Amino acid sequence: TTEKDQPDNVDEQHLVLIPDADGVAKNVFYGKEILKQNSAVVEDALRTKLGKVDWLFVLCGGGGGTGSSSFALDEAFNRYLKSVEAEGKVFYIATWPSAQELLNSTIAKNAMSLATDLKDAPHIILDNEKQMKILRGKVGILDLFPTANKAFAKLLSQTFKLASLKSSIQSFDSKDLERCMKENKRMLIGTTVIKNAQTPNLGAQILQNCIKRSPCPTTHTDSNIGALLLVINQEMASDPKISQHLDAAISYVGGRTKTLFSGVYVVDNAPGLVAIMLMGGLTE
């Protein structure tokens, strides 16, 4: 990348510059060629800087030249994981340009190229347009994408955190999480807060809200694998009627996926019923 495009406040030890590549000017063909030629540089940097890991998360911006070329390093990424005897996979998180950005035919072509490359790999796509609509009017234009990225990072970290917690009701453990993350093709992740857990059609409301408010592109198909994590407070946990509603909600969401993992957690300060939903193996 060019010097001006390097991220601010990032320690040099966390940055690897590809030799003789002063930007690729939105040219995916050139970007892939450069990355393949320097795959050993990237692989060596991963091994020396990260050491032994189980999972490798690759973040790439769709539409640009460098980000849209990222999958050219997939072989190097997997070779690195194999060399450290990792138990996980390479997982991609890519952005999809906004509607205005897609008016640029080069950006649209590059984004589609990346999406095509990723279609059979485990990945999440973040829809910039959808995120902008959710946040528009709430934050200024300078804070739009930083806020969206932080919200997504928080959602993902909360999912990981719940997978490490024990539950006296129903647990979603790290092995369940790994099973979901290893599923090839696209994954959708979304969350919602429902104040009244006794609302009719709770399952439908959870499903629709999580898909609608997800930063990922909407899906209309069933998934191969999924997870529904529910966080309730102590009062809800003691209510037998709510227990029936939760069971029905889990069954409803389970009808949209071939395999569903679920977890129910009691947190004293929960603002209501907090639901986090994963849908993996999506083909659209």
Report the location of each language-model feature.
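Tubulin/FtsZ superfamily GTPase core signature
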Residues: 1-284
